[in-house]
């Protein structure tokens, strides 16, 4: 999940942690589909190919011009970059994850996380309609970050509100209550971006201070040591920050001078410092960066020249290097990128020309290229995109004309198209929203005036 500050975006959440563990999230999604279709689908072959897919419209079939170059952003839709796993909107060039892209700017929301075990919702396998989520006292929305079982909303007034599971202090509201059903305010009132990981969260205030709270067992809060006692209120991690991203158990940030910082779990090399030892305080792993995204055991970043870099876990091709090898230091993937989104095992990027690219796991068609084949290198999906958010095995995209598109697994109606049919290519599902989000087996569509609707698995009860 990633975030930039200073700009509003159209990406609510990247679903990076929407399937925190490929086994828990993706596995549950696969099982749901298997039950629905009567058998388990075979694992797709892993190949790297370039495709120029046809785009299906939810109401029929149509075609979309698929042209473009590289890409890279989180959620993007307004005039700027969008963070991974959170609410974002493009600016000049966006989730959340969701996520971010414009040099020197920060996005408004961040990326998201993993879904509740789908087995709980599986028996009925009914379509969950697009439903409105009451925001209580929040008011107008400027950003949103949703994780597997909790959600953070950034108000237009700079205040943060939280609701959901709180077993690791991930709400940041300073109470020991395990579940909070109404949105409660966090301390402080000058935030501009928020991001969520597996069970921790990050927020950036307007002075460039980076704050963190929640689970710190892997040093993901950057306090100098791993802590088994959760941090239930925001604690300052760093200063002079302009972009950030929260992964499953690690965190990334970019300083005003372009230095890329990383810390937390490092089992797969996701910190990028050349080792596999956890890092409990921020370390510099690169210079000249402007955007970051953090996924499940891996990291993505875009430098000021528009070059895309990847490191960490390589399984299923999520790094886009052309193979499945893990990388403990940043590896160059390509040029011409504007923003990037990281999720469980699939990645998306938007090129400087608005083309959408995807790579990684594709078991349930979540890449949108018309196949079930994993892609070890970026393949072109479509054009005209300003934001993309990724869930456990589905994705939602926002085009510059305001239309919203969805594709991938639809076992619990997360594509918001009124069906339970998976879609291997982008299908238009609506328009008129300012923000999009995806996490686990759920999708979120929101407007600036505080209207927030979700489809799919209920992340919040």
Please name every model-derived segment:
Residues 1-8:
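N-terminal secretory signal peptides that target proteins for export/translocation
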Residues 8-461:
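Eukaryote-biased RCC1-like beta-propeller repeat architecture
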């Amino acid at each position: 999940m990633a975030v930039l500050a200073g700009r509003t975006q159209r990406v609510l959440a990247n679903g990076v942690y929407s399937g925190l563990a490929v086994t828990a999230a993706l596995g549950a999604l696969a099982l749901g589909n298997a039950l629905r279709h009567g058998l388990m689908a075979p694992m797709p072959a892993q190949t790297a190919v370039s495709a120029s897919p046809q785009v299906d419209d939810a109401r029929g079939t149509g075609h979309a011009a698929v042209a473009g170059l590289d890409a890279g952003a989180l959620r993007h839709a307004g005039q700027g970059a969008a963070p991974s796993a959170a609410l974002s909107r493009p600016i000049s060039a966006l989730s959340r994850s969701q996520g971010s892209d414009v040099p020197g700017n920060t996005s408004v929301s961040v990326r998201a996380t993993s879904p509740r075990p789908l087995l709980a919702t599986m028996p009925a396998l009914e379509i969950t309609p697009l439903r409105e989520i009451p925001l209580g006292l929040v008011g107008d929305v400027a950003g949103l970050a949703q994780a597997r079982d909790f959600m953070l909303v950034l108000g237009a007034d700079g205040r943060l509100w939280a609701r959901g599971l709180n077993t690791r202090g991930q709400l940041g509201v300073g109470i020991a209550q395990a579940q909070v059903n109404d949105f409660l305010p966090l301390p402080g009132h000058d935030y501009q971006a928020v991001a969520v990981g597996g069970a921790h969260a990050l927020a950036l205030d307007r002075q460039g201070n980076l704050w963190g709270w929640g689970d710190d067992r892997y040093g993901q809060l950057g306090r100098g040591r791993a802590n088994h006692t959760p941090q239930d209120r925001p604690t300052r991690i760093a200063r002079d920050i302009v972009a950030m991203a929260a992964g499953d158990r690690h965190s990334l940030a970019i300083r005003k001078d372009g230095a890329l910082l990383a810390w937390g779990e490092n089992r797969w090399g996701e910190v990028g410092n050349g080792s596999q030892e956890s890092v409990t305080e921020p370390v510099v792993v690169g210079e000249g960066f402007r955007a970051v995204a953090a996924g499940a055991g891996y990291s993505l970043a875009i430098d000021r020249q528009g070059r895309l870099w990847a490191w960490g876990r390589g399984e299923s091709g999520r790094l886009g290097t052309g193979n499945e090898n893990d990388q403990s230091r940043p590896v160059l993937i390509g040029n011409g990128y504007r923003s990037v989104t990281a999720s469980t095992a699939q990645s998306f990027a938007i090129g400087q020309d608005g083309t959408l690219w995807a790579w990684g796991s594709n078991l349930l068609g979540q890449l949108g290229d018309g196949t079930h084949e994993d892609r070890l290198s970026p393949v072109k999906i479509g054009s005209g995109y300003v934001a993309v958010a990724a869930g456990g095995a589905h994705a939602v995209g926002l085009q510059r004309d305001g239309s919203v598109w969805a594709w991938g697994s639809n076992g619990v109606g997360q594509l918001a198209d009124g069906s339970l049919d998976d879609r291997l290519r982008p299908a238009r599902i609506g328009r008129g929203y300012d923000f999009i989000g995806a996490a686990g087996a759920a999708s979120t569509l929101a407007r600036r005036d505080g209207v927030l609707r979700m489809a799919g698995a209920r992340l919040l009860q």
